[in-house]
């Protein structure tokens, strides 16, 4: 980009752009934000706006594009959604009073992680994450600038950090220099995150406190430094950082949350068909965000769970009060985001009126809860701070019909400020005086169509057509000449106009000053408002739980101190709601102290996966504090859920379905405890039959003997059902079918014992495959079944591993193959059987 022979204004642009090379620079020029050079070319394509040029007649015209100032936010949103940063350079002085080039400065850098005013649904958070490392430990901090939420934790490894970032649905990560190049590549390329670097951590005792580890303080400090670097203002709404531990909640990795459709349907990416969709009867944006958080972070503290259940029980018992409560909550606006607008200095009269309206509903909400007189509600009632003095200030000061733009006037109520009322009186009387002058001069001059008009250039003037110019009084003086008329003024009119303009200017300045004082006063209540927002959100979520419990016929679960689990006629509430209660077949499940594993067999499409997901959903709902879909539910409190349900190739990272299966299985058996829940669906199908069966058996044995977690293991390897004879804590169950006259009906009912058939050909028939193809498949199946009767396909016991060994021997026959080097390097004495088998399976692919 050439800098010679350019205007002072363009030199100013280049000087500013030099410091913001990684962002689109929106350069304020009058009523437009202009972009130049490469920014203009790229923005024109992304935003679909016209690309023009500056100095069109020069040899090297400068590419230029612009967006109107008043509608800039929608264009900024598009750039942010596309993954870019946007730097806003504002005019720092009135162009009319500027000497030379108008002073301009960047006042804010908006990024995917710091955007506040956007089209993002108000029921969702927008988290900015920071990630750093000290030795082998990782620090992770996150913040939502729109709500002020600020959290930090320490993590054991990079995989765990990536999982937490995925759970937060972050789009931008502030990284420290301690992260390796490979780690940064994974974040930016595989996870498609915008990475932003910060050199020094910020030290803020008020926000960071002195209770964090050095790693956590460093990570949270870098996040703060980045936020203040980009926002360039005081952010009084930021909450003091809260330290949390992953282990304080029911642990679920991103794959588990995705496969269980917790907050969105994995297939459609939409809310419909998710647990959040089922549970969301909230009335406020704050409640919606809190519900989403509770779904993703179920509790493991029995006391906290029961406290939530107690409130839900109260709301179920008091239907009419709950209905009144819901109606009152509908009048509650998004306090958290209103507070952030105060902190950002972006509050308009509408925001303050919404805040006052919300505060006016709090006494009613409190009264409803007090009427119930339940100990379960006492702590919530105590935290419902209506802040009446703030509501009175706003209600008495802000006009209900005030415009959103604070410089347009008519913001402050009449009667709030005596001086302002005097200015307004002068303006009103001036209008009356002008009408009197018009009538007086019309009568004196005899000009019947004489009238007084106004425009910004000429001010107030008498409008006289050319045909009446001969009747113009001598005390009129000419102000402007037009084609068919002329404009005149008088000393009296000029005096009245001067008084009115002075009053209007002083009124506008005073109104702005009063509004700023009120906004500053509101800022003093930020912490109390945030505490109120949290309480209202909690009340909202718990009343939502009660509404769903009633409409979906849920029951209150109990929790045992043992590891036994009993669910009578359990249901998958989301599936039930989608398909209708009349069509859904409930299933019971019992895993007592002596049973850890259920091996599930049965036809494809018969309901094995739904049965497994049903248990996970009931556990999650119970530990959220919600009621659950069953007739009776007695559960232990689980510390983690691990799943492998469904298979989708990870094409981005180049990992096969089988490799993903093995990684998820490894995570489960390594991290699960006796108080965990494992759900494995058709594990091993991503590789050859014998490999898959061997791995499945080894995994089952490992869980049975060492992990001892409660496990549902669905398999198409019917030979594995023989394991019940040697594994005492394993039981077989199957999905029942009805076969009559060659027709098969899936009953979707779980029964004891193994299945005897897979009915895969019947599923193919349902899918509509050609009849002759199905006949051929049936014939082949008959031949294979006859052959199977003559062969054993499963080791009789865990000590008889000859067949598995024979299958594995295929990998070592080619002695000259370079894969042998990798095989020799395997540290098998420090690997689990599963890791050995997975590694060998990967080596097999290289042969």
Curated annotation (Swiss-Prot):
Coiled coil: none annotated. The keyword DNA repair applies. InterPro entries: DNA_mismatch_repair_MutS, DNA_mismatch_repair_MutS-lik_N, DNA_mismatch_repair_MutS/MSH, DNA_mismatch_repair_MutS_C, DNA_mismatch_repair_MutS_clamp, DNA_mismatch_repair_MutS_core, DNA_mismatch_repair_MutS_N, DNA_mismatch_repair_MutS_sf. Residues 796-807 have a biased composition (Polar residues). GO terms for molecular function: ATP binding; ATP-dependent DNA damage sensor activity; damaged DNA binding; mismatched DNA binding. It comes from the Bacteria. Residues 788-807 are annotated as: Disordered. One of its GO terms (cellular component) is cytosol. ATP binds at residues 602-609. GO terms for biological process: mismatch repair. It holds the Pfam family MutS_II. Keywords: ATP-binding, DNA damage, DNA repair, DNA-binding, Nucleotide-binding. PANTHER family: DNA MISMATCH REPAIR PROTEIN MSH1, MITOCHONDRIAL (PTHR11361:SF34), DNA MISMATCH REPAIR PROTEIN MUTS FAMILY MEMBER (PTHR11361). HAMAP family: MutS (MF_00096). Belongs to the DNA mismatch repair MutS family. This protein is involved in the repair of mismatches in DNA. It is possible that it carries out the mismatch recognition step. This protein has a weak ATPase activity. This is DNA mismatch repair protein MutS. It comes from Streptococcus gordonii (strain Challis / ATCC 35105 / BCRC 15272 / CH1 / DL1 / V288).
